[in-house]
Amino acid sequence: MNRGLKHKILAVAAAVVLSITMLFSGCGQDSGADYDPLEGVSTITFRDDCGREVEIPETITKVAPSGSVAQMVLMTIAPETLVGLSASPSTDQLDYFPEYTWELPTFGQFYGSKANLNMEALIAAQPQVIIDIGDKKRTHKEDMDKIQRQTGIPTIFIETTLDKMPGAYRTLGYLFGKEEIGEKMASYIEDTVSYAANHAASINDADKKTVYYGTGASGLDCNANGSIQADVIDIIGAKNAVVGTDVSDKGGGTLVNMEQLYNFDPDVIVVTLDGIYSVIEEGDKSWTELSAVKNGNYYEIPGIPYCWLSGPPSVNRILGIWWLGNLVYPDQYDYDMVAKAQEYYKLFFDYDLSDDEAKAMLANSSLK
Protein backbone atom coordinates (compact mmCIF):
# COMPACT_ATOMS: atom_id res chain seq x y z
CA MET A 1 0.00 0.00 0.00
CA ASN A 2 2.00 2.98 -1.25
CA ARG A 3 0.43 6.39 -0.87
CA GLY A 4 2.10 9.62 -1.84
CA LEU A 5 3.92 11.61 0.80
CA LYS A 6 2.09 14.73 -0.37
CA HIS A 7 -1.25 13.04 0.27
CA LYS A 8 -0.11 12.06 3.76
CA ILE A 9 1.07 15.55 4.63
CA LEU A 10 -2.19 17.06 3.42
CA ALA A 11 -4.11 14.55 5.54
CA VAL A 12 -2.16 15.44 8.67
CA ALA A 13 -2.59 19.16 7.97
CA ALA A 14 -6.32 18.68 7.53
CA ALA A 15 -6.50 16.85 10.86
CA VAL A 16 -4.74 19.73 12.61
CA VAL A 17 -7.11 22.28 11.08
CA LEU A 18 -10.13 20.18 12.01
CA SER A 19 -8.88 19.80 15.59
CA ILE A 20 -8.44 23.56 15.95
CA THR A 21 -11.86 24.20 14.45
CA MET A 22 -13.47 21.76 16.87
CA LEU A 23 -11.58 23.24 19.80
CA PHE A 24 -12.96 26.71 19.17
CA SER A 25 -16.44 25.50 18.25
CA GLY A 26 -16.50 23.57 21.53
CA CYS A 27 -15.36 26.37 23.78
CA GLY A 28 -18.84 27.74 24.32
CA GLN A 29 -20.56 27.29 27.61
CA ASP A 30 -23.14 24.85 26.19
CA SER A 31 -20.78 22.67 24.11
CA GLY A 32 -22.48 19.41 25.10
CA ALA A 33 -25.72 20.67 26.58
CA ASP A 34 -27.96 19.41 23.76
CA TYR A 35 -26.20 16.10 23.14
CA ASP A 36 -27.45 12.92 24.79
CA PRO A 37 -25.76 9.79 23.39
CA LEU A 38 -28.43 7.56 24.96
CA GLU A 39 -31.45 9.40 23.60
CA GLY A 40 -33.66 7.23 21.41
CA VAL A 41 -31.34 4.19 21.34
CA SER A 42 -31.47 0.74 22.90
CA THR A 43 -29.05 0.47 25.81
CA ILE A 44 -27.33 -2.17 27.91
CA THR A 45 -25.69 -2.03 31.31
CA PHE A 46 -21.95 -2.70 31.05
CA ARG A 47 -19.75 -3.50 34.04
CA ASP A 48 -16.30 -2.11 33.35
CA ASP A 49 -12.97 -3.16 34.86
CA CYS A 50 -13.33 -0.60 37.66
CA GLY A 51 -16.49 -2.41 38.73
CA ARG A 52 -18.67 0.49 37.55
CA GLU A 53 -22.05 -0.27 35.96
CA VAL A 54 -22.50 2.09 33.03
CA GLU A 55 -25.45 2.42 30.67
CA ILE A 56 -24.16 2.41 27.10
CA PRO A 57 -25.74 2.08 23.63
CA GLU A 58 -26.38 -1.52 22.60
CA THR A 59 -24.91 -0.74 19.19
CA ILE A 60 -21.75 1.36 19.35
CA THR A 61 -20.68 3.23 16.22
CA LYS A 62 -18.96 6.36 17.60
CA VAL A 63 -16.14 6.17 20.14
CA ALA A 64 -13.58 8.55 21.62
CA PRO A 65 -10.33 7.12 23.05
CA SER A 66 -9.13 8.61 26.34
CA GLY A 67 -5.45 8.31 25.45
CA SER A 68 -2.69 6.66 23.45
CA VAL A 69 -3.23 3.08 24.68
CA ALA A 70 -6.95 3.27 23.95
CA GLN A 71 -6.20 4.69 20.51
CA MET A 72 -3.76 1.90 19.72
CA VAL A 73 -6.10 -0.90 20.78
CA LEU A 74 -9.20 0.58 19.15
CA MET A 75 -7.25 1.15 15.95
CA THR A 76 -6.69 -2.61 15.75
CA ILE A 77 -10.27 -3.78 16.27
CA ALA A 78 -12.72 -0.95 15.52
CA PRO A 79 -11.02 1.99 13.75
CA GLU A 80 -14.21 2.82 11.88
CA THR A 81 -15.89 3.83 15.17
CA LEU A 82 -13.32 6.48 16.11
CA VAL A 83 -14.56 10.07 16.05
CA GLY A 84 -11.17 11.43 17.09
CA LEU A 85 -7.69 10.50 18.25
CA SER A 86 -5.54 11.18 21.28
CA ALA A 87 -2.75 12.27 18.91
CA SER A 88 -2.48 12.73 15.16
CA PRO A 89 -0.59 9.94 13.36
CA SER A 90 2.83 10.69 11.95
CA THR A 91 3.40 10.38 8.21
CA ASP A 92 5.22 7.09 8.88
CA GLN A 93 2.15 5.67 10.61
CA LEU A 94 -0.47 6.57 8.01
CA ASP A 95 0.02 3.52 5.78
CA TYR A 96 -1.01 1.25 8.64
CA PHE A 97 -4.18 3.14 9.61
CA PRO A 98 -7.41 3.30 7.58
CA GLU A 99 -7.54 6.41 5.42
CA TYR A 100 -10.71 7.47 7.22
CA THR A 101 -8.72 8.06 10.40
CA TRP A 102 -6.15 10.37 8.81
CA GLU A 103 -8.28 13.49 9.14
CA LEU A 104 -9.83 12.86 12.54
CA PRO A 105 -9.55 15.62 15.16
CA THR A 106 -7.32 15.14 18.19
CA PHE A 107 -8.48 15.32 21.80
CA GLY A 108 -5.27 14.72 23.74
CA GLN A 109 -5.08 12.23 26.60
CA PHE A 110 -6.36 11.99 30.16
CA TYR A 111 -3.39 10.25 31.82
CA GLY A 112 0.38 10.47 31.66
CA SER A 113 3.06 13.14 31.62
CA LYS A 114 1.45 14.60 28.49
CA ALA A 115 -2.07 14.71 29.95
CA ASN A 116 -3.98 17.33 27.95
CA LEU A 117 -7.46 15.95 27.29
CA ASN A 118 -9.60 18.62 25.64
CA MET A 119 -13.10 17.98 26.97
CA GLU A 120 -14.76 20.59 24.73
CA ALA A 121 -13.34 19.16 21.51
CA LEU A 122 -14.21 15.65 22.63
CA ILE A 123 -17.83 16.58 23.38
CA ALA A 124 -18.13 18.42 20.06
CA ALA A 125 -17.28 15.19 18.21
CA GLN A 126 -20.35 13.56 19.84
CA PRO A 127 -19.08 10.06 20.65
CA GLN A 128 -21.54 7.59 22.12
CA VAL A 129 -18.92 6.24 24.51
CA ILE A 130 -15.51 7.28 25.82
CA ILE A 131 -13.26 4.24 26.25
CA ASP A 132 -10.21 4.23 28.48
CA ILE A 133 -7.84 1.29 28.05
CA GLY A 134 -4.64 0.42 29.93
CA ASP A 135 -3.38 -0.48 33.38
CA LYS A 136 -5.58 0.26 36.38
CA LYS A 137 -4.60 3.19 38.55
CA ARG A 138 -5.49 3.79 42.18
CA THR A 139 -7.95 6.56 41.33
CA HIS A 140 -9.33 4.99 38.18
CA LYS A 141 -12.93 4.61 39.31
CA GLU A 142 -13.11 8.23 40.46
CA ASP A 143 -11.37 9.39 37.28
CA MET A 144 -13.88 7.62 35.03
CA ASP A 145 -16.78 9.01 37.04
CA LYS A 146 -15.30 12.50 36.70
CA ILE A 147 -14.93 12.31 32.92
CA GLN A 148 -18.46 10.96 32.56
CA ARG A 149 -19.85 13.68 34.81
CA GLN A 150 -18.00 16.47 32.99
CA THR A 151 -18.88 15.31 29.48
CA GLY A 152 -22.27 13.69 29.96
CA ILE A 153 -20.97 10.79 27.86
CA PRO A 154 -20.81 7.17 29.11
CA THR A 155 -17.19 6.43 30.03
CA ILE A 156 -15.82 2.92 30.56
CA PHE A 157 -12.46 1.41 31.48
CA ILE A 158 -11.03 -1.83 30.07
CA GLU A 159 -7.83 -3.18 31.65
CA THR A 160 -5.03 -4.37 29.36
CA THR A 161 -2.15 -5.54 31.48
CA LEU A 162 -0.64 -8.45 29.58
CA ASP A 163 -2.61 -11.09 31.50
CA LYS A 164 -5.85 -9.12 30.99
CA MET A 165 -5.34 -8.35 27.30
CA PRO A 166 -7.00 -11.45 25.82
CA GLY A 167 -10.10 -10.74 27.89
CA ALA A 168 -10.00 -7.10 26.79
CA TYR A 169 -10.13 -8.09 23.13
CA ARG A 170 -13.01 -10.47 23.81
CA THR A 171 -14.84 -7.67 25.61
CA LEU A 172 -14.23 -5.24 22.75
CA GLY A 173 -15.37 -7.88 20.27
CA TYR A 174 -18.62 -8.13 22.22
CA LEU A 175 -19.11 -4.36 22.48
CA PHE A 176 -18.59 -3.79 18.76
CA GLY A 177 -20.34 -6.93 17.50
CA LYS A 178 -16.98 -8.31 16.31
CA GLU A 179 -16.75 -11.45 18.40
CA GLU A 180 -14.96 -13.48 15.72
CA ILE A 181 -12.03 -11.11 15.15
CA GLY A 182 -11.90 -10.30 18.87
CA GLU A 183 -11.49 -14.01 19.60
CA LYS A 184 -8.78 -14.38 16.94
CA MET A 185 -6.81 -11.52 18.47
CA ALA A 186 -7.33 -12.83 22.01
CA SER A 187 -6.18 -16.32 21.02
CA TYR A 188 -3.11 -14.95 19.23
CA ILE A 189 -2.13 -13.03 22.37
CA GLU A 190 -2.66 -16.08 24.58
CA ASP A 191 -0.65 -18.32 22.25
CA THR A 192 2.21 -15.80 22.14
CA VAL A 193 2.41 -15.38 25.91
CA SER A 194 2.15 -19.15 26.45
CA TYR A 195 4.92 -19.80 23.91
CA ALA A 196 7.19 -17.30 25.67
CA ALA A 197 6.39 -18.67 29.13
CA ASN A 198 7.29 -22.21 28.06
CA HIS A 199 10.56 -21.15 26.49
CA ALA A 200 11.50 -18.79 29.32
CA ALA A 201 11.00 -21.62 31.81
CA SER A 202 13.56 -23.71 29.94
CA ILE A 203 16.34 -21.13 30.40
CA ASN A 204 18.50 -21.66 33.49
CA ASP A 205 18.96 -18.61 35.66
CA ALA A 206 22.72 -18.69 35.10
CA ASP A 207 22.14 -18.59 31.33
CA LYS A 208 19.76 -15.64 31.35
CA LYS A 209 21.09 -12.67 29.41
CA THR A 210 20.82 -9.10 30.64
CA VAL A 211 19.14 -6.53 28.40
CA TYR A 212 19.43 -2.74 28.50
CA TYR A 213 16.41 -0.91 27.02
CA GLY A 214 17.49 2.64 26.18
CA THR A 215 15.23 5.45 24.99
CA GLY A 216 15.67 9.00 23.79
CA ALA A 217 18.45 10.73 21.90
CA SER A 218 21.14 10.10 24.52
CA GLY A 219 20.29 6.44 25.09
CA LEU A 220 20.66 7.04 28.82
CA ASP A 221 16.96 7.28 29.52
CA CYS A 222 16.01 3.68 30.09
CA ASN A 223 13.22 1.38 31.18
CA ALA A 224 14.44 -0.20 34.40
CA ASN A 225 13.65 -3.51 36.04
CA GLY A 226 10.06 -3.44 37.30
CA SER A 227 8.75 -0.94 34.75
CA ILE A 228 5.71 -2.01 32.73
CA GLN A 229 7.49 -0.44 29.75
CA ALA A 230 10.13 -3.19 29.95
CA ASP A 231 8.10 -6.25 30.87
CA VAL A 232 8.83 -8.02 27.56
CA ILE A 233 12.41 -8.52 28.79
CA ASP A 234 11.19 -10.65 31.69
CA ILE A 235 8.55 -12.43 29.62
CA ILE A 236 11.08 -13.88 27.18
CA GLY A 237 13.28 -15.17 30.02
CA ALA A 238 15.95 -12.46 30.11
CA LYS A 239 16.91 -10.05 32.90
CA ASN A 240 16.65 -6.30 32.88
CA ALA A 241 20.20 -4.95 33.22
CA VAL A 242 19.04 -1.84 35.07
CA VAL A 243 18.45 -2.75 38.70
CA GLY A 244 18.67 -0.84 41.97
CA THR A 245 17.40 2.43 40.50
CA ASP A 246 14.19 4.39 40.65
CA VAL A 247 11.55 2.86 38.41
CA SER A 248 9.26 4.90 36.19
CA ASP A 249 6.38 3.51 34.15
CA LYS A 250 6.34 6.65 32.02
CA GLY A 251 7.67 6.48 28.48
CA GLY A 252 10.77 8.56 29.29
CA GLY A 253 11.82 6.02 31.87
CA THR A 254 14.73 6.32 34.31
CA LEU A 255 17.82 8.43 33.65
CA VAL A 256 21.20 6.77 34.23
CA ASN A 257 24.75 7.90 33.47
CA MET A 258 27.54 6.18 31.53
CA GLU A 259 29.30 5.05 34.71
CA GLN A 260 26.14 3.25 35.81
CA LEU A 261 25.70 1.74 32.37
CA TYR A 262 29.24 0.35 32.46
CA ASN A 263 28.55 -1.09 35.90
CA PHE A 264 25.43 -2.79 34.52
CA ASP A 265 27.44 -3.88 31.42
CA PRO A 266 24.48 -5.56 29.67
CA ASP A 267 24.76 -8.54 27.34
CA VAL A 268 22.33 -6.93 24.88
CA ILE A 269 21.42 -3.30 24.21
CA VAL A 270 18.20 -2.27 22.46
CA VAL A 271 17.32 1.37 21.76
CA THR A 272 14.32 3.16 20.32
CA LEU A 273 14.20 4.64 16.82
CA ASP A 274 14.89 8.13 18.20
CA GLY A 275 17.81 6.74 20.14
CA ILE A 276 21.53 6.34 20.00
CA TYR A 277 21.87 3.44 17.54
CA SER A 278 23.60 5.36 14.73
CA VAL A 279 26.02 6.95 17.21
CA ILE A 280 26.99 3.53 18.57
CA GLU A 281 27.25 2.16 15.03
CA GLU A 282 29.64 4.95 14.08
CA GLY A 283 31.96 4.02 16.94
CA ASP A 284 31.28 6.64 19.60
CA LYS A 285 34.06 6.05 22.14
CA SER A 286 31.83 6.42 25.19
CA TRP A 287 30.00 3.23 24.17
CA THR A 288 32.70 1.09 22.57
CA GLU A 289 33.96 -0.71 25.69
CA LEU A 290 30.55 -2.03 26.71
CA SER A 291 30.40 -5.80 26.30
CA ALA A 292 27.25 -5.62 24.19
CA VAL A 293 28.88 -3.17 21.79
CA LYS A 294 32.18 -5.07 21.56
CA ASN A 295 30.22 -8.24 20.74
CA GLY A 296 27.90 -6.55 18.24
CA ASN A 297 24.84 -7.15 20.39
CA TYR A 298 23.20 -3.75 20.05
CA TYR A 299 20.01 -3.19 18.08
CA GLU A 300 17.33 -0.69 17.15
CA ILE A 301 13.76 -1.49 18.20
CA PRO A 302 11.40 -1.44 15.20
CA GLY A 303 8.90 1.35 15.72
CA ILE A 304 6.36 1.60 12.89
CA PRO A 305 3.52 2.21 13.45
CA TYR A 306 4.39 1.79 17.15
CA CYS A 307 7.50 0.75 19.06
CA TRP A 308 7.44 -3.06 19.28
CA LEU A 309 8.25 -3.10 23.02
CA SER A 310 6.31 -0.22 24.59
CA GLY A 311 5.65 3.49 24.25
CA PRO A 312 2.85 2.97 25.09
CA PRO A 313 2.91 -0.59 26.45
CA SER A 314 -0.07 -2.22 24.76
CA VAL A 315 -0.75 -4.90 22.16
CA ASN A 316 2.50 -3.85 20.43
CA ARG A 317 4.28 -5.87 23.13
CA ILE A 318 2.93 -9.06 21.58
CA LEU A 319 5.01 -8.51 18.45
CA GLY A 320 7.85 -7.40 20.73
CA ILE A 321 7.82 -10.80 22.45
CA TRP A 322 8.41 -12.57 19.14
CA TRP A 323 11.09 -10.08 18.11
CA LEU A 324 13.09 -9.82 21.35
CA GLY A 325 12.89 -13.55 22.03
CA ASN A 326 14.29 -14.33 18.58
CA LEU A 327 17.01 -11.70 19.03
CA VAL A 328 18.22 -12.65 22.52
CA TYR A 329 17.69 -16.43 22.38
CA PRO A 330 17.66 -17.40 18.67
CA ASP A 331 18.11 -21.11 19.43
CA GLN A 332 15.06 -21.23 21.70
CA TYR A 333 12.93 -18.74 19.74
CA ASP A 334 13.66 -20.23 16.33
CA TYR A 335 11.41 -18.94 13.53
CA ASP A 336 11.32 -16.53 10.59
CA MET A 337 10.87 -13.05 12.08
CA VAL A 338 9.75 -11.60 8.74
CA ALA A 339 6.89 -14.10 8.64
CA LYS A 340 5.99 -13.34 12.28
CA ALA A 341 5.84 -9.61 11.56
CA GLN A 342 3.65 -10.21 8.51
CA GLU A 343 1.29 -12.39 10.54
CA TYR A 344 0.93 -9.73 13.23
CA TYR A 345 0.41 -6.80 10.86
CA LYS A 346 -2.27 -8.67 8.93
CA LEU A 347 -4.22 -9.66 12.05
CA PHE A 348 -3.99 -6.42 14.02
CA PHE A 349 -3.75 -3.79 11.26
CA ASP A 350 -5.26 -5.67 8.31
CA TYR A 351 -2.09 -4.70 6.48
CA ASP A 352 -0.23 -6.91 4.01
CA LEU A 353 3.36 -6.29 5.04
CA SER A 354 5.68 -7.14 2.15
CA ASP A 355 8.96 -9.00 2.57
CA ASP A 356 10.85 -5.82 1.66
CA GLU A 357 8.92 -3.72 4.17
CA ALA A 358 9.51 -6.23 6.95
CA LYS A 359 13.20 -6.52 6.13
CA ALA A 360 13.52 -2.72 6.13
CA MET A 361 11.93 -2.59 9.59
CA LEU A 362 14.40 -5.21 10.80
CA ALA A 363 17.47 -3.75 9.08
CA ASN A 364 19.07 -2.61 12.35
CA SER A 365 17.08 -5.03 14.47
CA SER A 366 18.39 -8.48 13.58
CA LEU A 367 21.40 -10.53 14.64
CA LYS A 368 24.62 -9.14 13.21
List each language-model region with its residue ranges.
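Short helix-initiation/N-cap motifs at beta->coil->alpha
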Residues: 49-51, 105-120, 246-258
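Short, low-complexity disordered leader/linker segments with a strong preference
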Residues: 1-59
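A short, structured surface patch at a secondary-structure boundary
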Residues: 70-125, 129-137, 241
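A contiguous binding-surface segment within folded domains or other stable secondary-structure elements
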Residues: 125, 243, 247-300
